[in-house]
């Protein structure tokens, strides 16, 4: 910041958003970071990890029943906007800013649903899944660009490297808290491959 003199700074994080910074057993998240920084020092924090559509119902309180396609007000802490587009590509987050006289102002924010559907039941009793918002068509140019990489990865994943008759435990509630046979197998493979004396991995970095 001192050498480059950027007009804006946007932080991309994976720390989680917790109402009013009440992170419980989790590590401190985006709210705590924004409060710890100089006021307005970031234009925006684009977060992840807690897998929330960060749309505020009131100050320091997220909307827990957000409906796709409806207005979404992002959080703001210490003059810093905090946004998060839920999980798994369900939304594209869009923030429009105006930059005038050295000042940034957010003029619009929305979560754009990516072909999300809801279940509706008609008068005849039949049920159907329908789109919340108009369908977003696939971009054929992008598919052509990315398909070779996807196919290459798929071919590598289909190579058989071993087999087991037992279950490799990868349940989130297990791998986050205790050692599992899957974790030990992965670490043993890493040690064998590299000739290391020991191996360490994050609890739950690889899971079901």
What residue ranges belong to the model's regions?
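Active-site-adjacent helix-turn-beta-strand microarchitecture at beta-sheet edges
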Residues: 25-158
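Loop/turn elements at helix/coil->beta-strand transitions in domains of secreted/extracellular proteins
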Residues: 3-9, 40-43, 78-80, 195-198
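Short acidic, glycine-rich surface-loop motifs adjacent to enzyme active sites
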Residues: 1-21
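A glycine-rich phosphate-binding loop feature that marks nucleotide/adenosyl-phosphate handling sites
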Residues: 111-114, 163-172, 202-208
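Active-site metal-binding loops of divalent metal-dependent hydrolases
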Residues: 13-16, 48-50, 86-87, 203-205
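Glycine-rich phosphate/diphosphate-binding loops and the adjacent beta-loop-alpha structural elements
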Residues: 155-179
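Active-site catalytic microenvironments in core metabolic enzymes, especially phosphate/sugar-handling
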Residues: 180-186, 205
């Amino acid at each position: 910041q001192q050498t480059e003199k950027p007009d804006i700074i946007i932080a991309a994080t994976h720390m989680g958003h917790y109402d009013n910074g009440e992170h419980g057993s989790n590590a401190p998240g985006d709210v705590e970071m924004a409060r710890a920084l100089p006021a307005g020092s970031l234009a925006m924090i684009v977060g992840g990890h807690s897998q929330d559509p960060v749309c505020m119902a009131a100050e320091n309180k997220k909307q827990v029943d957000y409906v796709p396609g409806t207005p979404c007000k992002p959080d703001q802490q210490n003059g810093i906007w905090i946004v998060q587009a839920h999980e798994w590509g369900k939304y594209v987050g869009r923030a429009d800013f105006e930059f005038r006289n050295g000042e940034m102002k957010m003029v619009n924010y929305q979560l754009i649903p990516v072909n999300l559907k809801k279940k509706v039941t008609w008068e005849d009793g039949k049920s159907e899944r329908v789109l919340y918002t108009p369908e977003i068509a696939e971009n054929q140019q992008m598919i052509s660009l990315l398909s070779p990489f996807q196919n290459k990865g798929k071919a590598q994943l289909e190579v058989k490297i071993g087999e087991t008759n037992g279950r490799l435990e990868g349940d989130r509630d297990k791998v986050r808290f205790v050692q599992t046979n899957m974790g030990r197998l992965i670490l043993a493979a890493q040690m064998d491959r590299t000739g290391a004396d020991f191996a360490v991995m994050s609890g739950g970095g690889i899971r079901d």
